Structure formats: structure tokens, C-alpha cells
């Protein structure tokens, strides 16, 4: 029988509930418990797949093809456990399910209401994760802030949940903020007291308080908070601002968060094994020489839009004893100012995914710069499509080459709509989504990096390489190093006689893990460390023993 942890947040939004939930998952796993984490988002969208990256940040794709909140990426990276579509719940998906049941007559003519029907559906979703994952502990992060009207059905549902299970099968963790007032020189507890009061008014008494602060919290303050909030002082956990999100699990362990959770759940407090995580944090705090990486995108004003890409770069740098010096380059600025001005001095260039016309010419210019100046390059999804367009225009002689998405009237649509997408009308959840196999060609950089014949990668796209141009581009020097097993879909391309130039149709960033960097990102960083060689004979060699050839596990 699974145990359940509910993580709520108060005082302000973006308090760090996702990192707390992911960190707790890491700590529980280090003690031998299996964990699954789900996110309950209070917005009315069915999923974030159609939301602007400026509104929501990155859309994280699970192996079964769900478009989810970026927090699921944190859950997977911290616990090294694959989540599924069941781990992402929104108000929109709950209401959609309840309305569909009402239309089918499942409620036998009863009046359908928020209580009990919506709250029961929420509880069933949580239990479904427990049943399908078989996890010892299921952690649920409730999005939003206590006091928001949007979160009320979820808070009511988790209040009701304690009536479905034994008391020691559920624990409530509330994350709050302790602001410091400089003029008085004091840390203020009143916002936390009021947040807990609001939570109590709903019927939830938190068992544990995780208090965010930018300065240490002494025992006297913990006793005060515990006394006013009805929580044991040992269960008042200080969470100080950290130098890295990866140091948070160790800090929370030292504060006793995991012990308090295990005590509440009546679980044995086994010896923890965090040696690998401690080594990871040590390397983060003691990096080697910096590597300048340009991330050329169209959503760079919001860093969260490329969260998994940044984390994958960070994982690769940790593995190769490098310090990531990330430069955010707006693709539109390249169009107006030129690639040389903005990319001069970069050790590597990454062009990530995206949609639409804006900034595409800047991405193509950046790719041309990487190719001609022999700067290590990695293209992801749209980044691969732009790389194909750049080569077709400037090397293969197809001046009008483009994507059918960007220019429907192009004479040479080297990127076109997938056949199965021709009659698709709805935007949400209709792309090529989730894990698909990719067969790698022997004696290529891609195959050497993966050290596998077939790999499994996550996709999110509607457009694909147009096979009508495959022969022409290959004859002009393009290398197709990975395809679908039937050879129909081009998944991975690269160039010979270049230090490192590789691009993929999929999203490898979703499979990168701390301590287990994705091979493509690892190859990019190693090539960047070597810098730009002066001749092809000095080019990056993927057979080098320096590379950690860690194959992807089939999820």
C-alpha cells in the first residue's frame, strides 16, 4: 500500500515547491523507497502543450507522449525515474473527464458538482498513479498558492484524501517564505502564520513546514513558528537559498526533512546512499575551465523556456569537468546585428526547438556561422530543420529551400508535414509525441557517441525531413546518421570534416540526468573543450576514450 505526501505552497508563487518535491523524492529513493511524483496544476488548459513558452516555460514531454509542466523534468532528473501522462493533472483535464462522464450518463442523472464529483476525480487520479507506478511513496505537488481560488478544488481533494487512507499513510508539507526586512533587521514569520491559518481554514493541518529564507533560521525562530502554526519545531525545516538546485536535497537532508516525513508515514529510516549525489555537488562547486556556449533561441527572455536544454548542458559540463558559461542569444538579434558580432568567441552553439517563423533566419545564420567557422554545433528539433535548410540553400544550391511550416509556397520544401499530420485540425496533443526508436548508422559520430545500434528518444514535432531531397543532400555531403527503423524518417544528421556538427529531430535534453549526461550533449561539450581545430585532421574524435559512452536505457 502506497504512502502519500502532499506539497502545498504559501505566501508567494514560485516558492520552489517543485524542487522541494523532487528533492524529497531523491532523499526517499536514497533510502531504498520507490517514488512517483505528480503535479496538480490549477489552470483550465487540458495540458500546457498549446501554451506560449513566455506564459508557461518549457513543455516537458514524457515517454508516453504527454505534454506536461516543466516540474516533471525536475522530478525525472532528481529521481532518475520516468514519469507518465498520469503524473500530470490539470483543472482542464479534470473537468474534461467529469463532463465526458456526465455526457455518457455515468452519474445516473445526479447533479454534477465540484464537491463531490470534481474532488473525487482528483483523488482517483492520485490513486491511479499509486496503482500504476507501484511506488512506495507518491508525492503530489499542488500548483498555485494557498488562498488562490483556482487551487481550492485540489486543496479540498487532498483534505478529503486523508479520509480514504489511514492517518499515517498521508503527510502534508507546506512550503512558505520567511521574508527579511532590512530596515528592522528581522526575519518575519507573520506571512507564514497567515498562510498556515488559510490552509487550516480549508481543513488541512500541515505536518511539516519548509521555510524558504535567504539567511539562517535559528532554533528560537523555529520554536516560534512551530508554536503559532501547530507544528513540532523539529518539523520546521529551513530551506536557504542555494547555489544550485542540485544542492537542495543535501541541505534538506541535513535539516531532517526526510526523517520527519518517514516518521509521519511510519516508515523505517534506512541508511541513505547519497555518495553519487554528493560527488555531483562537489564537482558543481569545483568546476574546471569555463566553456562558452551560445544558446540561440526565440524565447530567451524567459530562461525556463529552455530549462531541460540548460540542465543537459550543465550535466555534460559536470561530467567533463567544465564550467558552463551560457550566453543567451536572441535569434532575432542575429538577423539585425549579424552572427559574427554575437557569436564571435563562442566555444559551442546550440539551436533548440521552437515553432513559427520569428527568428528562424537568425537561427539559420547562426548555423551557417557554426559550419563555416568550425564551431561545435548541436541542433534540436527545429534546430535540425534549420540546419537542413541552411545546407540546402548554401551548399546544395537550393536557394529557395525552406520548411512548409515557414514558407508554404517554397519551391523546395526540404522540411514538410508528416503524412499522418495532413488531416489534423486540433493543436493540443496531436503532434508526433513520446518515445520512438532511432536506428543509427555505423561509422558515424552519432553511433560512436551512443555506442548503440538503436536508441529511444522523445519527440515533439509535426514536420520532418522531406525524403524527396535525401539523395541530393547526401550527394552534396550531408550525412544521415540516424533514421526510424524502417528508414522512412530522418532523425539524426551530421557533417564530416567538422569538429562537431550534429542535429537531431528529437529532444535529447529530456533524457539527460545529473551524473548521466546525454551522449550528444557530452560530445558537444568535449568538442567545445578542444576548441576549434585548425585542420580537419585535428577534428573532434568521438572514439576518444575521454568520452563517457553511456547508452540510453530503454525506458
Swiss-Prot record:
Keywords: ATP-binding, Glutamine amidotransferase, Ligase, Magnesium, Metal-binding, Nucleotide-binding, Pyrimidine biosynthesis. ATP binds at residues 14-19, 71. Residues 536-555 are annotated as: Disordered. Pathway: Pyrimidine metabolism; CTP biosynthesis via de novo pathway; CTP from UDP: step 2/2. Residues 292-534 form the Glutamine amidotransferase type-1 domain. It catalyses: UTP + L-glutamine + ATP + H2O = CTP + L-glutamate + ADP + phosphate + 2 H(+); L-glutamine + H2O = L-glutamate + NH4(+); UTP + NH4(+) + ATP = CTP + ADP + phosphate + 2 H(+). L-glutamine binds at residues 354, 382-385, 405, 462. Residues 1-267 are annotated as: Amidoligase domain. It holds the Pfam family CTP_synth_N. CTPSs have evolved a hybrid strategy for distinguishing between UTP and CTP. The overlapping regions of the product feedback inhibitory and substrate sites recognize a common feature in both compounds, the triphosphate moiety. To differentiate isosteric substrate and product pyrimidine rings, an additional pocket far from the expected kinase/ligase catalytic site, specifically recognizes the cytosine and ribose portions of the product inhibitor. This is CTP synthase. The lineage of its organism: Bacteria, Bacillati, Cyanobacteriota, Cyanophyceae, Synechococcales.
Amino acid at each position: 500500500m502506497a504512502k502519500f505526501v502532499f506539497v502545498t505552497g504559501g505566501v508567494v508563487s514560485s516558492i520552489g515547491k517543485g524542487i522541494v518535491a523532487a528533492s524529497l523524492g531523491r532523499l526517499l529513493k536514497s533510502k531504498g523507497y520507490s517514488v512517483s511524483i505528480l503535479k496538480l496544476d490549477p489552470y483550465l488548459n487540458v495540458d500546457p502543450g498549446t501554451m506560449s513558452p513566455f506564459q508557461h516555460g518549457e513543455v516537458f514531454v514524457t515517454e508516453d507522449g504527454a505534454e506536461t509542466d516543466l516540474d516533471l523534468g525536475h522530478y525525472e532528473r532528481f529521481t532518475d525515474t520516468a514519469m507518465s501522462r498520469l503524473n500530470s493533472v490539470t483543472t482542464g483535464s479534470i473537468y474534461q473527464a467529469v463532463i465526458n462522464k456526465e455526457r455518457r450518463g455515468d452519474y445516473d442523472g445526479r447533479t454534477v458538482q465540484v464537491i463531490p464529483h470534481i474532488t473525487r476525480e482528483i483523488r482517483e487520479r492520485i490513486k491511479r498513479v499509486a496503482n500504476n507506478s507501484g511506488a512506495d511513496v507518491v508525492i503530489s505537488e499542488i500548483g498555485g498558492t494557498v488562498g488562490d481560488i483556482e487551487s481550492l478544488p485540489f486543496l479540498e481533494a487532498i483534505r478529503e484524501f486523508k479520509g480514504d487512507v489511514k492517518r499515517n499513510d498521508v503527510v502534508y508539507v507546506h512550503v512558505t517564505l520567511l521574508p527579511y526586512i532590512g530596515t528592522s533587521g528581522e526575519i518575519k514569520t507573520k506571512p507564514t502564520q497567515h498562510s498556515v491559518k488559510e490552509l487550516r481554514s480549508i481543513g488541512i493541518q500541515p505536518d511539516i513546514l519548509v521555510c524558504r529564507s535567504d539567511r539562517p533560521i535559528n532554533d528560537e525562530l523555529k520554536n516560534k513558528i512551530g508554536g503559532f502554526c501547530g507544528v513540532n519545531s523539529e518539523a520546521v525545516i529551513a530551506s536557504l537559498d542555494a547555489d544550485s538546485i542540485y544542492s537542495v536535497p543535501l541541505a534538506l537532508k541535513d535539516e531532517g526533512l526526510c526523517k520527519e516525513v518517514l516518521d509521519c508515514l511510519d516508515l523505517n529510516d534506512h541508511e541513505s546512499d547519497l555518495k553519487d549525489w554528493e560527488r555531483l555537488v562537489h564537482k558543481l562547486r569545483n568546476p574546471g575551465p569555463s566553456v562558452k556556449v551560445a544558446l540561440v533561441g526565440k524565447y530567451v527572455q524567459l530562461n525556463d523556456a529552455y530549462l531541460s536544454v540548460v540542465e543537459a548542458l550543465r550535466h555534460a559540463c559536470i561530467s567533463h569537468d567544465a564550467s558552463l558559461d551560457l550566453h543567451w542569444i536572441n535569434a532575432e538579434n542575429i538577423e539585425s546585428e549579424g552572427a559574427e558580432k554575437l557569436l564571435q568567441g563562442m566555444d559551442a552553439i546550440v539551436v533548440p526547438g521552437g515553432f513559427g517563423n520569428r527568428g528562424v533566419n537568425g537561427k539559420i545564420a547562426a548555423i551557417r556561422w557554426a559550419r563555416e567557422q568550425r564551431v561545435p554545433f548541436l541542433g534540436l528539433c527545429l534546430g535540425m530543420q534549420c540546419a537542413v535548410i541552411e545546407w540546402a540553400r548554401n551548399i546544395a544550391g537550393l536557394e529557395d529551400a525552406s520548411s512548409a511550416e515557414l514558407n508554404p509556397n517554397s519551391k523546395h520544401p526540404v522540411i514538410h508535414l508528416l503524412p499522418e499530420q495532413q488531416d489534423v485540425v486540433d493543436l493540443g496533443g496531436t503532434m508526433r509525441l513520446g518515445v520512438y526508436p532511432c536506428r543509427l548508422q555505423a561509422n558515424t559520430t552519432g553511433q560512436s557517441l551512443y555506442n548503440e545500434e538503436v536508441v529511444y528518444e522523445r519527440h515533439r514535432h509535426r514536420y520532418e525531413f522531406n525524403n524527396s531531397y535525401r539523395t541530393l543532400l547526401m550527394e552534396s555531403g550531408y550525412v544521415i546518421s540516424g533514421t526510424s527503423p524502417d528508414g522512412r524518417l530522418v532523425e539524426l544528421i551530421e557533417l564530416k570534416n567538422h569538429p562537431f556538427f550534429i542535429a537531431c529531430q528529437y529532444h535529447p535534453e529530456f533524457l539527460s540526468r545529473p551524473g548521466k549526461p546525454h551522449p550528444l550533449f557530452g560530445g558537444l561539450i568535449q568538442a567545445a573543450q578542444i576548441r576549434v581545430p585548425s585542420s580537419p585532421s585535428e577534428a573532434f574524435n568521438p572514439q576518444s576514450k575521454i568520452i563517457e559512452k553511456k547508452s540510453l536505457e530503454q525506458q
